[in-house]
Each structure stands twice: as C-alpha cells, then as structure tokens.
Amino acid sequence: MPRRRVVGQRKILPDPKFKSELLAKFINVIMQDGKKSTAEKIIYKALDTASEKKGEDHLVILEAALDNVRPSVEVKSRRVGGSTYQVPCEVRPVRRNALAMRWLVEAARKRGEKSMALRLAGEMLDASENKGTAVKKREDVHRMAEANKAFAHYRW
C-alpha cells in the first residue's frame, strides 16, 4: 500500500481518425520502438480491410472482437505453506481490456498473412465471430480458472 496518495489513471487522448479512446489504446499496444505513425497505419489499414470483408463499421468490428476476447476470470499464483496454488480471481475492467488487446496482437503476430495489417484484420474478424487464437487463449484461461475453483477461498 502506498504511504502517500494513490496515483490515478492517466487520461488517454482519442485517436485522430475515429475519435475513440479504445482505438488509441489499441494503437499504443501495437506500437513498437515508439513508432506511433506506423502503428496507426497498421491499425487503420486492418480496420479498413476488416470492414470491407464483413461490411460493418470499423469500431463495431473492433468492439465485437475485443468483447469475445475479454477474460472475466484469471488465475494468480499464491504460495501457501510451501506449495503454490493457482487461485482464480476476477479481472478488473481496465485489465480486461488490456489483456484482450494484448492477446489479439499476439495472436495476429503469429498468423501467416503477408503484412501485419492483414494479420490483424484476419484475427479481428475471427475474434468477432468467436473463433481464432485470441479467443482460444481466453477459453484456456477460463478453463484454468474453472479447474482451480477449489482454491478460490485463498483469494486475497
């Protein structure tokens, strides 16, 4: 626990094209080595491709994809009397979004398409239809939490 004041969450500026804070956060997750303009190009191209294929609005596809990837529970390691238990815990809303975005990007990076924009578009389309690697990751995390439900009383 901090002895002084608790530091609040920083306000994030919405992205320039769609005026969405969620999209601005996603751009920051994609960004590598501080190259924000490159990350923006990748995201906007991916959203254009995805909305062209599905025929829906850009932000609707992104929101649907993130909804299907967001975890509601996860497991945390907790050491009790010499043995380590995987204790299921609820995930806070901010962390839910962060994990969903991170998993989407990781899954997209592992795909086989030519460019990152195409990989991301493919993964977002898959996730919006409740399939794909990112959704599988969420299901694995939920399965782990379900399997370790017996240790839920060790929560802190």
UniProtKB/Swiss-Prot annotation:
Keywords: Ribonucleoprotein, Ribosomal protein, RNA-binding, rRNA-binding, tRNA-binding. The keyword RNA-binding applies. GO terms for biological process: translation. CDD domains: uS7_Bacteria. Transmembrane segments: none annotated. One of its GO terms (molecular function) is tRNA binding. GO terms for cellular component: small ribosomal subunit. Coiled coil: none annotated. The keyword Iron does not apply. Pfam families: Ribosomal_S7 (PF00177). InterPro entries: Ribosomal_uS7 (IPR000235), Ribosomal_uS7_bac/org-type (IPR005717), Ribosomal_uS7_CS (IPR020606), Ribosomal_uS7_dom (IPR023798), Ribosomal_uS7_dom_sf (IPR036823). NCBIfam families: rpsG_bact (TIGR01029). HAMAP family: Ribosomal_uS7_B. Part of the 30S ribosomal subunit. Contacts proteins S9 and S11. Belongs to the universal ribosomal protein uS7 family. One of the primary rRNA binding proteins, it binds directly to 16S rRNA where it nucleates assembly of the head domain of the 30S subunit. Is located at the subunit interface close to the decoding center, probably blocks exit of the E-site tRNA. This is Small ribosomal subunit protein uS7. It comes from Shewanella pealeana (strain ATCC 700345 / ANG-SQ1). The lineage of its organism: Bacteria, Pseudomonadati, Pseudomonadota, Gammaproteobacteria, Alteromonadales.
